[in-house]
Structure formats: C-alpha cells, structure tokens
Amino acid sequence: MPPCCRALCEDTTVEKQILILLAAYKGGRFIRPMVDSILAQDVGGWRLILSDDGEDTAPILQEYADKYPDKITHYRSGRRFGSAQKHFMHLLEQFGGQADYIMFSDQDDVWHPDKVRLTLRLMEQ
C-alpha cells in the first residue's frame, strides 16, 4: 500500500468538529440504514443534524435523537422547503458555523464505516 494511503487508513484520530447534515423528504424506508451507517463510523468528533420536510420520517428521526442525544439532533423548522437545495441551504444557515467541516448526506445513502475519517483526511491535505 502506498504511504499516502497507509496514513489515511491507519489514522483514526479526529480532532476537528464535523457536522453531518441530512435533509430528508418522505424517506422513511431509507432513514434507518442511513443513520445506522453514520453511527457505525470508525471515528468520533461528528454531530448529525437530521431534518425532515415530510410526514413519514419525523418519528424515526426523533427516535434516533432520543436514543443518541450526544450525537444526533432532530431539527424541526416547521417549514416546507420544496427542494433538497433549499433544505440544505437552510440547514447551513442554522448550523454552518458550529463545526470545522460540514458533510452532506442524502437520505438514501449508506456510508462506509471509514467515510468520515477518509474524507476529513483528504480535505486536510
């Protein structure tokens, strides 16, 4: 393995604050695998902001926020955004200044356990 790849793969220390934004819309059937994949990350230092723009995801998002209050926030704006872009922009306005780095997740993503660590290392190069 090349030295640059070895360093990325072996370093599990994260000292930066990372905010992961997830804007969901009628994503009830996708949310659990997505959130579980973030919870399975091999580094800490992240906080997940879950926001929904539809009816079926709110109870699931709240369940996760209640279970993992130190890692997950269920943000309820009370607004309908009409597009993922507007929803994410609103989340950036509300939370963007609270972290060193921001990552975005779609509701139907499933992240590899090393995604946060490897992405952060690449961003810092």
Predicted segments with their positions:
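Nucleotide-sugar donor-binding/catalytic module of glycosyltransferases
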Residues: C5-Q125
